[in-house]
Each structure stands twice: as C-alpha cells, then as structure tokens.
Amino acid sequence: MNVALQELGAGSNMVEYKRATLRDEDAPETPVEGGASPDAMEVGKGASPFSPGPSPGMTPGTPRSSGLFWRVTCPHLRSISGLCSRTMVGFQKGTRQLLGSRTQLELVLAGASLLLAALLLGCLVALGVQYHRDPSHSTCLTEACIRVAGKILESLDRGVSPCEDFYQFSCGGWIRRNPLPDGRSRWNTFNSLWDQNQAILKHLLENTTFNSSSEAEQKTQRFYLSCLQVERIEELGAQPLRDLIEKIGGWNITGPWDQDNFMEVLKAVAGTYRATPFFTVYISADSKSSNSNVIQVDQSGLFLPSRDYYLNRTANEKVLTAYLDYMEELGMLLGGRPTSTREQMQQVLELEIQLANITVPQDQRRDEEKIYHKMSISELQALAPSMDWLEFLSFLLSPLELSDSEPVVVYGMDYLQQVSELINRTEPSILNNYLIWNLVQKTTSSLDRRFESAQEKLLETLYGTKKSCVPRWQTCISNTDDALGFALGSLFVKATFDRQSKEIAEGMISEIRTAFEEALGQLVWMDEKTRQAAKEKADAIYDMIGFPDFILEPKELDDVYDGYEISEDSFFQNMLNLYNFSAKVMADQLRKPPSRDQWSMTPQTVNAYYLPTKNEIVFPAGILQAPFYARNHPKALNFGGIGVVMGHELTHAFDDQGREYDKEGNLRPWWQNESLAAFRNHTACMEEQYNQYQVNGERLNGRQTLGENIADNGGLKAAYNAYKAWLRKHGEEQQLPAVGLTNHQLFFVGFAQVWCSVRTPESSHEGLVTDPHSPARFRVLGTLSNSRDFLRHFGCPVGSPMNPGQLCEVW
C-alpha cells in the first residue's frame, strides 16, 4: 500500500487546534456514521485520503469527525448567489432534479423573489442603456454587477439602521426569503453552496457514460451506487450488524455474550472498526517535534454533542429521554427484549453520564502547553492500568512492532486516570453493552430505513429538525465524500475548477499577508524581539489552494486507495472495509514524517483551515466561488468574502492557541513575557465582550470562542487593509447599481452577508455549548463593533448599538 497519509483521529472532546472557518457541525443533519470517528485523514501526494477535513479548530491532527448527526467539515448547502459561469455549466448539464422538494411557502417566496429580481433587472438594463452612453459614469453595469446587485438588495433590510443592527440590516431580507428547508435545523451560505456542489457530484456519478481511466474514480462510483441500492439495504435489514456483533462475541442486550473478553471487544470496536469508546487514539505530528509523527491519546466516548447534555439533566430532560428511547429502539431492532433492553440501555446511559462528569470542558483545554504530556507506553500503563496498553496499541497499529518505551502524547492525564478507575469499578456486562453500543452508533446509518426513522425522532428533539426530507442521493454523496473524498474531488475539480482562480487566490493571500504584517509593525504593545519572530512566522505560513496535484494523476490517485475493496451490492460491507482500511493507513503513518503537502479537506469542501503544526493555511476549491469569490465581482466583495476568510485563517496563527507555536510548527514559548502579558490583556477584553452576547436568553462562552473571535476580528482588519492597498494601486472601482453603497460600505455588507443564517432554537443551543465559533449574528456584530473603519464608513456615533465606545482589538 503506497500511502503517505496521516490519520487525524477525531472526537468531539479532543484538544482543538486545527482551525477552520466554520465548524463541521454547520453540515446538515444528514445521517453519517458514528459518534466521534477517527476515520478522517490528511492526505498528500501519494497518500491515502478519506473522510477529510478538520473539525473546526481541533488540535494538531484533529479531523473532521464523521458523526451520526455531525459531519465534521463541509456544510450541505444551497446558494443565494449562484455559481460562477463555469461551475454553472457543470451544475446544469444533463441533470434532473438537483435539489429536494420544497415547501409551498418556499415556492411562493421563490416565485416572488424571481419576479422582483426580474423587475429590478429590467430597470437596471434600462439604466444600463442610458449609462453606457456615458463611458465615464462610475456605475458598473455589466451583467455580473447587475446580478450581484440584485442579490445584495434582496438580502438587505432597509428598515433597519446599519448603526442599530448591522446583521439585520445586511441579512434581514435574506432571512425572510429563506425559511428553514424541511429536514434542516440550520441554513446558511455554506449549506447552500455545499448543496450545489453535491448536485454537481450527483450528476458526475450518475452519468451513464461514466468511463474513467482511474480505478479510484471507478471505486467512487461503485461506492456511491451501492449506497443508492435502497432495495438491497432494506432486504438485508439488521442482519449485517447482527452478524458483526455475533462475530465480536455477542451483546448482552440481544443474546449470549462472552463475559471475559473486554480487551478483545475493545480491540475490535476501537481498532478494527475505528469507534472511540472511552478514549480516542490517532497518529499525528508531535506538537513539540512537528517533523515526526507520534501516537496520541485523548478523551472521547460521549454520543451526545456535549457533556452539558448529560450533566444539566433538568434542562436537557427531553433530550436524555429521547436519547434513551433511541437506544432502546435500536436495541430492539437488533433483537433485544422490551423490558431488559431499556433497563440495560439505562445502565449504558448512566455510564456515559459518569464519563461526562470526568470529561474536561472545551474552554478548559485551550492551553496545549498545560495539557500536553509525553510519556512512554509503560508510563501510560502506570497512569491507566485498567487495560493492557501495549497489547491494545500493538493491535491497533499492526503490523508495527511496539515496545514499552514507545512514546505517546496524552492530552488529559486526569481524564485517563479517572476513566481507568471507572472501567475497574463497572460491571463487565455494562462495559460490554457500552462497547457494542459504540459499534452500533457507528454502523447503523448503513442499515435499513427503520434505523433512519429512529434517528429522525432523536434529531427532532436534539436539533428541532422536523422529519427529514433529505434525498437519499445527498446522504450518499456525503458518505462517498467521507470514504473516497479525494477521488470524488478529482471528478469535481476536472468538471468545475477554473485554474486561474488559484493564481488570483494566491495573489490575494500575498496582499492580505502584507497587510497583516504592516499592522503587526504598528502594534504598540509588542516588543521588537517578539514582533520580529511574529513577522517571520507570518512570512513562513505555507498556503495550499484548490486541490492537491496528485488527484489529477490517475496512477497516484489509484495508489492512495490501493487495498480498499468496494463491493457492488453491500453498502454495509463497504463501510466496514473503510474502517479496516483506515486503521491500516493510520498504522502506516507512525514511522513516516509528516508531509507539508498533505491535505485535511477534500477539494469540494466549502471551508478552509489553519494547521499550527505545519504553519499552513488551506483553501479548497469548494469555497473559491460566489458569494465568497468570483472573478467578475467587485474587488470589494471578493476582499469582504474570501479575503476575510483568508485573513481569518492567517490570524489563527496568532490566536490564543496558534500563538503558542513557532514558525516551524513547534509548541514552545517564543514570546517575551511583557508582550505575552499585553496579549492576554487584549484577549481578556474580547473574551468579556463576547460573554455579554445572548441567544434566546443564553449567554455565549467568550472563553470557548476566543480563538475564532480573534481570527474573525483580525481577518476582517487584514482583508480591509489589503483592499485599501489594492485601491491605492489600481484606483477606485465602479460602484454597483441601485444598492446605494460606497465600495467601502460594500466590503462590510459583503462580509456580513456571507454569514446570513437561520436555525432552530434547539440547534442554536447546541451551537452555544459545542461550537468554538460564535453564532453567525455575533460573528458580524462583534467583529464590526470593534472595527474603526466600519464605524467611520457608516458614521455610527459613540453610544449607538454598533459603537458601544470600547473597542477590543488584538491584531
């Protein structure tokens, strides 16, 4: 197996350092497999990719995690701004119905929007005839400018003053025109764009003349079609999972089980099938020696999105009851008896509650210097003696030979010590039930409709999602993206990506980096030695744009998936093969150095990320399209869209976590004490600012969201300064027609409209307790109320809601 792929490990509770523009939970509630899954990987030339992508801001080596409810990375979406012309061709050609059915209200609103847009277009075209007679006129009347002006106008709410509530001013019209689609708990620009990308992929995979010279691309189509074989999946029912449970040694809930096989079951569940009971194990770059990979162990094992759901039992009584009902229903579908199944699942739930009690909250895990502990396997054995770590890790990383002296990095020593004690005092039958429950969670999305229906009931309680109307093909595209994401990316890039976009994006990154470094030179609170080291780090940031080159080389692409077998008539078996293959790929990484050219997101992903152990920023092809970027849009919109995303990722190198890493990607102290103290004073202001914001009466956690808030604020400033530098070099742009905004104002409106969003109250609560990003509304309000440039261009007086008087600035 010719692989150079790095296993990223996952787990919603892992230390979080891979910094993404948005959380993967902004993905849809399309069922994907398993709780916290370590099947996500980085991939580079000659490497083996799967379910890629970073969980929003996770630790070095943290991935997008495939969750039963949470797909960690890309959002599923539907665009308000349309696709660039080249992508639109790929989107429309030969396709049938590309999106799911809409509600009657949505259709009425869509019709009204089209009518208004047509009237606007007619007026603007008429104006265009007149204005084009005067070439000196400062209004842009190209077709692209007219279309984007219409999009902006229909998203605005002119009844609100921009100095009162800039989010409502920018997004009020969009919110009115975008009721939540059926089956979704949230809807935003990212979701919309991902839906469009999915429709492109559907067309490519269902093409009856599909004839690729790449075996990996052929595997991608076979995998996708096996997922679409609903009749075959229904015919098999629960039997594939029943057989698997029997093979492992049985499950007390459904029948006889081997009472003396804790280690064997743990090895099968966590090793062969890559579930994460109790803890997660993954291979990633050593934070203190980033040129080498090392075994890493972290806390894991909770099924619900956050420990809060287990511990605040009064507030979350409905969720816990729905979860227990879900557990019971799945146990019954697999052969459990009514009375005993609920009783035993209650015991499993109580065990998860005990795990939640010892799980360290996200906001207490932001300083990796404090939670990073490197030790040998023998020292790990002494710390957590409830299991044989050498036996377990040797099985997990077979055929590698390990010894007691093998180094391991542990994040959360107290957690592992306490989980070992918990295992020792828990009855063997409960341990077995919990382990098999982790396997059940991971695999049931590959089974028949009854399991999907059970999940939908839990989703409704947890996220406020009504009965799902997500078409099967969308679920299958997501699964294919998880399994063969870079082979799928090869198809996507060849069909849609404009190569010139890569060159233009590289130029924008350079401009934004220059603007950031110029601002760095003006900071009065930073000493010269630290400033010079920070400038060197900014200069050293490595950028990757669009896609990795190897995906367009058939032989190299085939090599990375060599050994992954695809059955044409068993989707369940294809998923099992994926878990097994990913385990082998993970083992292959330990003795190899990390590659700087590895990718952690597939090209079709609508997201971006910064990875501190490589000091790199990555922008997949999926996000390099409208509304973030379009070649024929005003520069104000491009800098306000993809420019702010670029600035955001670059600023992550200097947020409260990224700043701990040097230019080589190593975790070490490189700041002078006085500058570090000043940095903490500035971030304390921002933490307190965001602590004051509320959603439905519930406060934001300014500590949990600090890194993303720093990146949002720094990214906006860098992008705007880069735009001003562009204007100094090229001169003022023509203005858009009819919108009544200067181009400087347009920059800020373009930034805000990227974050237009709607979501259910339940989903909003889930975001507050799990997401390292602030809610969309406060990503706009919090950032702009700290921007002197915004306040000046919109004339917001001190004391107005958008200008409270005190500005919190870090970078």
Curated annotation (Swiss-Prot):
Q: How is the cofactor bound?
A: Binds 1 zinc ion per subunit.
Show the disulfide pairing: 140-145, 163-796, 171-756, 227-476, 685-808
pH dependence of this protein's activity: Optimum pH is 5.0-5.5. Inactive at neutral pH.
GO cellular component entries: cytoplasmic vesicle membrane; Golgi membrane; plasma membrane; transport vesicle membrane
Q: What does this protein do?
A: Converts big endothelin-1 to endothelin-1. Also involved in the processing of various neuroendocrine peptides, including neurotensin, angiotensin I, substance P, proenkephalin-derived peptides, and prodynorphin-derived peptides. May play a role in amyloid-beta processing.
Indicate the family of this protein. Belongs to the peptidase M13 family.
What is the protein's given name?
A: Endothelin-converting enzyme 2
